[in-house]
């Protein structure tokens, strides 16, 4: 933490308009919407509210930028990579400003925003930049006198809908691979957290991306988001958010032009701690797995299964750890838990906490709101949780840990998989055979062994079942932004 700077004070929000064709636009409707600080419930600024008419403008710009012969389509792939490297450099230059803005707007702890979010964004962009001139097809020795090869071509115009829990990280996860592969994009940031995306829009222009390649339309899901999902001239939509909204997006994509869809959705991830695990390590990773960013993570370790013989000690240590939190302004250095994102999420979490109490779980600590302003909830730990309770089945998205007990390996695998979700899972054991056996059996897109929430640009991320379709990051994530074209050429004579 020695390299951590002090957050900016008196931050001025410079960019509040819609970004289309490298220019700033007022909304067609003339409407604006407020952006709040969740720690104080006070208004930060007003943002231009995009809707269908603004999405139409953005799609027109993106389609024009994607036309055959355009500067973007004729640009060398290595030059696309250079632009992405330049964007990463500019984000690094503005790292302190963006981290302060993310903390103010999204309630993120400033150290996490600066070190983890901004650090991850910069690394991911540079990873994607390096791929730009390495996206290759193949030649195939087909039967007959033919020469056959494949091209991996950009999908086209991509709509990208960003969540509020990791606004800047998810923006980069979306635009990095899409631009590396040569697509153009229309981004809709979450209405709660549009500020960092709009600042990055200014950096897109500064980096030298041609007009129309990146367009950012802030607005609400039922209007701007729905317009993207159902648009007849958008070729692909990528969404990170709730499973409920993901279903609507996939339905709209199917009913419109059958556009390609990538979804990274909800989770109720199991974390299994065997009796032979390093207990200190397991307690800390399981704790961070559910309390990081106030529990507002799709991969949260929200179903914690602990082997019976170590259960009581694990609960004791987990409660002791949760009680160490200092709540308050996420920009303050002594604070290590900030607010939930908004009133709706705050009320939902408190309702689920009350359901845990009513259904018979043992409240070990926390269990209610904190403070007299802002959307703060006490770090909460439940023990004696059973599988049929709401807190064991529903995605809470808050600082609530529920600890369940198990007796056998077969039993815990069955219980861990007994969910509609399949985003991630964790296993803690010193037994390699057990780790391999259980990781193979769990229905999850990512399984961590003796760690949790370890995510990197090089590694694919995505879910099984109702946690989504497709993958982000890594080479697998790049594949989601290309179409494979087969080209077969008749030749006079084939030679091997």
Swiss-Prot record:
Keywords, comma-separated and alphabetical: Acetylation, Cell projection, Cytoplasm, Lipid metabolism, NAD, Oxidoreductase, Phosphoprotein
SUPFAM superfamilies: ALDH-like
EC number per UniProt: 1.2.1.19, 1.2.1.28, 1.2.1.3, 1.2.1.36
Gene3D superfamilies (alphabetical): Aldehyde Dehydrogenase, Chain A, domain 1, Aldehyde Dehydrogenase, Chain A, domain 2
Gene Ontology molecular function terms on file: 3-deoxyglucosone dehydrogenase activity; acetaldehyde dehydrogenase (NAD+) activity; aldehyde dehydrogenase (NAD+) activity; aminobutyraldehyde dehydrogenase (NAD+) activity; benzaldehyde dehydrogenase (NAD+) activity; retinal dehydrogenase activity
Active site: 264 (proton acceptor), 298 (nucleophile)
Main location: cytoplasm
Gene Ontology annotations for the cellular component aspect, listed alphabetically: axon; cytosol; synapse
Region (Mediates interaction with PRMT3): 331-496
GO biological process: cellular detoxification of aldehyde; fructosamine catabolic process; gamma-aminobutyric acid biosynthetic process; maintenance of lens transparency; retinoid metabolic process; retinol metabolic process
Keyword Phosphoprotein part of the UniProt annotation: yes
This protein's pathway: Cofactor metabolism; retinol metabolism
Binding site for NAD(+): 162-165, 188-191, 221-222, 241-242, 264-266, 344-348, 395-397
Entry keyword Chloroplast: no
Phosphoserine modifications at: 408
InterPro entries assigned to the protein according to its UniProt record, in alphabetical order: Ald_DH/histidinol_DH, Ald_DH_C, Ald_DH_CS_CYS, Ald_DH_CS_GLU, Ald_DH_N, Aldehyde_DH_dom
Record PTM N6-acetyllysine, positions in chain: 86, 123, 247, 348, 362, 405, 414, 430, 490
Location of this chain's protein in the cell: Cytoplasm, Cytosol; Cell projection, Axon
Catalytic reaction annotation: an aldehyde + NAD(+) + H2O = a carboxylate + NADH + 2 H(+); all-trans-retinal + NAD(+) + H2O = all-trans-retinoate + NADH + 2 H(+); 9-cis-retinal + NAD(+) + H2O = 9-cis-retinoate + NADH + 2 H(+); 11-cis-retinal + NAD(+) + H2O = 11-cis-retinoate + NADH + 2 H(+)
PTM annotation, UniProt: The N-terminus is blocked most probably by acetylation.
Purpose of the protein: Cytosolic dehydrogenase that catalyzes the irreversible oxidation of a wide range of aldehydes to their corresponding carboxylic acid. Functions downstream of retinol dehydrogenases and catalyzes the oxidation of retinaldehyde into retinoic acid, the second step in the oxidation of retinol/vitamin A into retinoic acid. This pathway is crucial to control the levels of retinol and retinoic acid, two important molecules which excess can be teratogenic and cytotoxic.
Subunit structure: Homotetramer. Interacts with PRMT3; the interaction is direct, inhibits ALDH1A1 aldehyde dehydrogenase activity and is independent of the methyltransferase activity of PRMT3.
Protein family according to the UniProt entry: Belongs to the aldehyde dehydrogenase family.
Protein name: Aldehyde dehydrogenase 1A1
